[in-house]
């Protein structure tokens, strides 16, 4: 989620009653009772690529997560959702010259991606509250222990293409495409 993305992705030790922390499934049991959480996150990227002779700008806007968190009773919680696991998206051309083949261009392209579906559950094993007295103040302390687990399923397709285009028609252009389907 954007909440954890804003902390540099350091979400494992964080507990928040109003956010689903899919990086640490033990936190699902801390969701507030009677308040299911639904979250949709988007991610935007602006990338500028530069070489000595060329530059290219590219933009990306896509789903970062689609998550539902459900408190279960006083001590339990569950969550499920979908998010990108990896994305592929590039298109490059590298012009070249060879004394035998003349001018030609190496082309590289890739697109697609793999998504991750998860489901998880958590349960509080220990939940204690106590008052600690100091000289003039009383403070409420909580100590708890929870366990949790997530199960994941990866799916998606991506392709990588490479080829050479020759300006001289005596040479044949070549193209190779590799398509990969993930369902594990």
Where would I find each of the regions flagged by the language model?
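Subset of outer-membrane beta-barrel
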Residues: 1-184
């Amino acid at each position: 989620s954007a909440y954890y993305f804003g902390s540099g992705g350091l979400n494992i030790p964080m507990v928040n009653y109003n956010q689903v922390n899919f990086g640490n499934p033990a936190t699902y049991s801390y969701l507030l009772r009677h308040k299911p959480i639904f979250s949709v996150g988007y991610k935007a990227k602006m990338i500028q690529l530069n070489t000595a002779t060329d530059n290219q700008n590219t933009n990306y806007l896509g789903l970062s997560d689609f998550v539902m968190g459900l408190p279960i009773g006083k001590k339990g919680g569950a969550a499920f959702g979908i998010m990108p696991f990896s994305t592929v998206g590039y298109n490059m051309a590298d012009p070249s010259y060879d004394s035998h083949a003349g001018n030609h261009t190496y082309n590289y392209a890739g697109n697609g991606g793999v998504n991750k579906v998860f489901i998880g559950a958590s349960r509080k094993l220990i939940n204690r509250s106590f008052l600690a007295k100091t000289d003039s103040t009383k403070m409420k302390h909580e100590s708890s222990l929870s366990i949790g687990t997530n199960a994941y399923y990866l799916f998606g397709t991506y392709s990588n293409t490479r080829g050479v285009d020759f300006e001289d028609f005596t040479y044949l252009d070549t193209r190779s495409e590799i398509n990969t389907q993930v369902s594990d």
